[in-house]
Amino acid sequence: MMQDLRLILIIVGAIAIIALLVHGFWTSRKERSSMFRDRPLKRMKSKRDDDSYDEDVEDDEGVGEVRVHRVNHAPANAQEHEVARPSPQHQYQPPYASAQPRQPVQQPPEAQVPPQHAPRPTQPVQQPVQQPAYQPQPEQPLQQPVSPQLASAPQPVHSAPQPAQQAFQPAEPVAAPQPEPVAEPAPVMDKPKRKEAVIIMNVAAHHGSELNGELLLNSIQQAGFIFGDMNIYHRHLSPDGSGPALFSLANMVKPGTFDPEMKDFTTPGVTIFMQVPSYGDELQNFKLMLQSAQHIADEVGGVVLDDQRRMMTPQKLREYQDIIREVKDANA
């Protein structure tokens, strides 16, 4: 309930404020229109009074040169006539006195006190409107545009040499440190291709164990190796041992030799190696070598390792193949 009452009071107050604003605007507009509407009548009345005043002067003095008076009755001189009219005692002066604009200034006691025409309501209305409208306005705009033009003229003259000086300043340090010549990198020489290599792989027992010698010798013979030179096993081109040797097998324990008559011996593993280049196709010989190593590892329960005695990986096998191709290209 209180909110509704507050809302009603706010609305009523807003309406009252708007009504006051509209009434004030309407009243000021009405007064302004009436002031502009009465102004021509006042001007006609003042002009008519001036004409009657001039006719009286002509009748009293009888001089025809009084018409010069009418030429000087411009609106800008309305103030001078209004100041001269309140003194009827001096109408006997010669007519040329009214044509001179400086005589009212020479007789200040006569022009200072106009007792009859001072209370006119029309004079205070005309004076504030006409004086600022005609006298000061044409003089001020002529002086104002002249001063900024003269002031702005020297600015571009003084500002012109500044960029020129700034342009020459960075050019003064002629002996600027020149960048030191960068040494050209030495041409990278192509690594000479190897003309021979040794491909090595191992068959070893699991960590902490050893291979049985009798079982190992049987698996070696089943893989096609034949005991031969240097007391090690060789894989020849033909399974019966004829033809050149493709790759060989040695004991991992020094001196790396075998004794076929010894049945009860153990070893941590064996090493299979192939000299490249070799007889025939080296890549095919490498595949046969890998198959033999896997066969022996499966028979004795061991694992196939690379030349670093790490688990053989596909990446290492591709590396071996790349080495074989490089040697073949070098010997082509």
From Swiss-Prot:
Q: Write the record's keywords in alphabetical order, separated by commas.
A: Cell cycle, Cell division, Cell inner membrane, Cell membrane, Membrane, Transmembrane, Transmembrane helix
Q: Which residues lie on this side of the membrane: Cytoplasmic?
A: 28-332
Tell me where it mainly resides. Answer: membrane
Task: Indicate where this protein resides in the cell.
Answer: Cell inner membrane
Indicate, by first and last residue, each region the UniProt record lists as having compositional bias (Acidic residues).
Answer: 51-63
Q: What biological process terms from GO does the record include?
A: division septum assembly; FtsZ-dependent cytokinesis
Q: Which residues lie on this side of the membrane: Periplasmic?
A: 1-6
Give start-end positions of Low complexity composition bias.
99-115, 123-149, 160-175
Q: What are the TM regions of this chain, as residue ranges?
A: 7-27
Query: Would I find Transmembrane among this entry's keywords?
Result: yes
The answer on whether this UniProt entry bears the keyword Secreted reads no
Query: Region labeled Disordered — which residues?
Result: 42-190
Any one Gene Ontology cellular component term annotated for this protein: plasma membrane
Give the record's family classification: Belongs to the ZipA family.
Q: What is this protein called?
A: Cell division protein ZipA
Q: Its gene?
A: zipA
